[in-house]
Each structure stands twice: as structure tokens, then as C-alpha cells.
């Protein structure tokens, strides 16, 4: 349940769907397996293993999951069969095979193999935090996060969500914190960061498991590099990497949160319920504190 990486989107809290409405809409876009000549299939699936429901509600949070199944048909397999067929035609009919005919043969081979191809599946989860008005997506890759947002919009007939656009850039804030050797409020420097310079060939410096206040680290900023990723700890509850795109990576929920969830969950459902609430509340509160140090949202 605990998301290890997060992209998030501010939502219009006045226009969020109720759990039953969301479930009904997602049922119309439920996942089905690839059929026949389909290369892939995508749809919503149960977010928890102990329930078939497409929405898992926990207090002010709603959890959903998008599943994608893709056919695996290696290009090398198609190429080998195509070469065999071309050689067979050349030997049996004593003629060359042109580009157009090769393309037609390739398409025929693909159509023959596709129904029997192996599949691989992936899923992206998201939690609506209706109290704070955030959609938290368990993926820091923009393409994956945008995809589940798009699918939710399609299923709901619209969803007012925006990119997290603050008055000050995360990179500027992180660079300032590293330069001054400390953070503001409930944040502390951890032990990892990434810095980038400028120029035709952009120099990149990655620092891992080091004291970020050390002179050799700070000197990179003084030499003109900016921080693009920074390891932070928030109120002794969450350790994470903040990126210049305002995504969170390598999230670790420290013992205090894990223990609180375990004390409130007697079984799988209870633990999932408690973990979902604690994760959504702590992460959203942390994000709001970050937004305040970034000058608030752009108008």
C-alpha cells in the first residue's frame, strides 16, 4: 500500500466523485484481457487483493488501479520467420521479393503469431485524497502518471486536475537549501543529491550517502550547478528524494508511521485501510508544507 514513488496532481475539491459514482464509472472501463489481434488492453482493476471492487475507500481516500496487458512478440522472431519465407519464395519461384511484398509478409506473420503471443502486465495505482484535494499516483514517470489521469478523465467524463505549478521552482528551493546547509520547517537534508551544470555537454554530479553540508558538495553550487534531486527527511516520518519536476522518489516511511498502521489494522483489510489513510494524510501534509516554501501555487 505504501507508495514508493509519487507524482501528484492538485484537484478541484468541489468536483470530486463520490466512491459509488467512481466505482460505477470505472466499471464501464474495467480491464479485460487482450483478444485476438490486440497488441494491448488497458482498464481498471481491483486495487486490493482481498476485494473485487474497483474502488477501495478508506475514510477520506479512494484507491484505484489501472492495469495494462501487452503482447510480447520479439522483432527477432518475426525477422527470422520472414527471412525463411523470403528464402522459400526465392528458391521455389526463382524471383526476388520486393519491399512491398516483404511488408505484406511481415504483417501476415505478425497476425498469425499475435493471438498466440505471451503477455506481460503492469499496473499503476492512485489514491484520491478528498480532504486535501490531491491525486497521488504511484509512479514518478510522467508518462505513466499522465496515462492513469487521462483514463480517469475518460471514465468520469472529466476531472479537474492540474500539474503542480508553484511560484518558485523545486530546483531553486533545493539549490538554496543545499547552499545554506539546512532546510526550513520540518525538513532536513538527507545524504543524496544530484546537481547539473549548463553548457552543450551538461555536467552531472551525483552524491550518495554523504554529508550534504560538506564543502566539496556545496562547492558544486558555488560553481554554478543547480540541484535537480535532493534527499530529504520530513518530521522523522518520511525520507524521500525530491526532484526538479516535483515528483517524489525512493520514498521510505519511517518506523513511526509503519507502527501506527500496524496497531490500527487487525487483518489484511484493516491494515490496508489504516496504511492508506496514514500514507495519504502524511504525504499530502508534507506536500502542502513544501508548496508553502515554494511560494504557493501559481495563479
UniProtKB/Swiss-Prot annotation:
Gene Ontology cellular component list: cytoplasm; nucleoid
Highest rank taxon of the organism: Bacteria
A Pfam family matched in the record: RdgC
Family annotation (InterPro entries): RdgC
Keywords, alphabetical: Cytoplasm, DNA recombination
UniProt-annotated location(s): Cytoplasm, Nucleoid
BP GO terms, sorted: DNA recombination
Function: May be involved in recombination.
Family to which this protein belongs: Belongs to the RdgC family.
Full protein name: Recombination-associated protein RdgC
Organism from which the protein derives: Neisseria meningitidis serogroup B (strain ATCC BAA-335 / MC58)
Amino acid at each position: 500500500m505504501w507508495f514508493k514513488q509519487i507524482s501528484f496532481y492538485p484537484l478541484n475539491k468541489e468536483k470530486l466523485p463520490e466512491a459509488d459514482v467512481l466505482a460505477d464509472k470505472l466499471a464501464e472501463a474495467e480491464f479485460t484481457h487482450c483478444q485476438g489481434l490486440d497488441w494491448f488492453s488497458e482498464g481498471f482493476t481491483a486495487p486490493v487483493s482481498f476485494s473485487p471492487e474497483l474502488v477501495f475507500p478508506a475514510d477520506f481516500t479512494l484507491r484505484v488501479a489501472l492495469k495494462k496487458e501487452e503482447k510480447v512478440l520479439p522483432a527477432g522472431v518475426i525477422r527470422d520467420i520472414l527471412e525463411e519465407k523470403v528464402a522459400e519464395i526465392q528458391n521455389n519461384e526463382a524471383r526476388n521479393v520486393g519491399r512491398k511484398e516483404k511488408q505484406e509478409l511481415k504483417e501476415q506473420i505478425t497476425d498469425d503469431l499475435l493471438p498466440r503471443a505471451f503477455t506481460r502486465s503492469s499496473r499503476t495505482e492512485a489514491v484520491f485524497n478528498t480532504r486535501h484535494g490531491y491525486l497521488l499516483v504511484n509512479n514518478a514517470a510522467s508518462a505513466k502518471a499522465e496515462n492513469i489521469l487521462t483514463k480517469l478523465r475518460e471514465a468520469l467524463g472529466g476531472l479537474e486536475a492540474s500539474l503542480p505549478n508553484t511560484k518558485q521552482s523545486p530546483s531553486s528551493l533545493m539549490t538554496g537549501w543545499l547552499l545554506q546547509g539546512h532546510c526550513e520547517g520540518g525538513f532536513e537534508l538527507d545524504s543524496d543529491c544530484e546537481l547539473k551544470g549548463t553548457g552543450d555537454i551538461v555536467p552531472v554530479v551525483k552524491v550518495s550517502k554523504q554529508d550534504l553540508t560538506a564543502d566539496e558538495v556545496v562547492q558544486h553550487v558555488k560553481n554554478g550547478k543547480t540541484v535537480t534531486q535532493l534527499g530529504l527527511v520530513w518530521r522523522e516520518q518520511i525520507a524521500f528524494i525530491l526532484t526538479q519536476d516535483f515528483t517524489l522518489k525512493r520514498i521510505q516511511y519511517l518506523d513511526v508511521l509503519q507502527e501506527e498502521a500496524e496497531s490500527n489494522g487487525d487483518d489484511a483489510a484493516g491494515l490496508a485501510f489504516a496504511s492508506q489513510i496514514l500514507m495519504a494524510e502524511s504525504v499530502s501534509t508534507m506536500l502542502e508544507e513544501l508548496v508553502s516554501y515554494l511560494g504557493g501555487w501559481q495563479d
